[in-house]
Swiss-Prot record:
One of the record's GO cellular component terms: membrane
Gene coding for it: infC
Organism classification: Bacteria, Pseudomonadati, Pseudomonadota, Gammaproteobacteria, Legionellales
Keyword Protein biosynthesis found: yes
Protein name: Translation initiation factor IF-3
Family: Belongs to the IF-3 family.
């Protein structure tokens, strides 16, 4: 016999899969019926035409409930789908600048930057120096400071400008809106 897969371990045990001698039983209406033998609990589930489902296997004794297992799985999958739908995947977008970026290009990139922030994404700003431009890093810092000032109402600086090799990096994240 092979070892149970992770998927089988995640599923609740039902009916004859419950091997413990005693369980704490919750009936169809959600009322506690107390601690009964597993055999009695199975009989009660059969009489009501439903399944005996182990809700809390780690409790002493395990908690079991009489319910429709198919409906239980359906409700569980609906809850998980709803939780996944509500989760927002935060992405990090990257915008590349140069110390010689002209004003028209700057405005286009600024518009994109604000759009990314309004969508809830973080933005990594990379300012790349070439050749002798490294001697004038203050030009790059001015651009980053200007970006910071222009986005002050929609963004906060998550990572201040720092130098990595031939580039300056800064990360902006959207302000929390409530």
């Amino acid at each position: 016999m092979s070892a149970p897969t992770k998927r089988e371990n995640d599923r609740a045990r039902i009916n004859e899969q419950i091997t413990v001698p005693e369980v704490r039983l919750i009936d169809v209406d959600g009322n506690q019926a107390g601690i009964v033998s597993t055999r009695e609990a199975l009989r009660a589930a059969e009489e009501s035409g439903l399944d005996l489902v182990e809700i809390s296997p780690t409790a002493k004794p395990p908690v079991c409930r009489i319910m429709d297992y198919g409906k239980f799985l359906f409700e569980l999958s609906k809850k998980q789908a709803e939780a996944r739908k509500k989760q927002k995947q935060i992405q990090v977008k990257e915008l590349k600048f140069r110390p010689t970026t002209e004003d028209g290009d700057y405005q286009v990139k600024l518009r994109n930057l604000i759009r990314f922030l309004n969508h809830g994404d973080k933005v990594k700003i990379t300012l790349r120096f070439r050749g002798r431009e490294m001697a004038h890093q203050e030009l790059g810092m001015k651009i980053l400071e200007r970006l910071q000032a222009d986005t002050a109402d929609v963004a906060i600086v998550e990572q201040h400008a720092k130098r990595e090799g031939r580039q300056l990096l800064m990360v902006l994240s959207p302000k929390k809106t409530k």
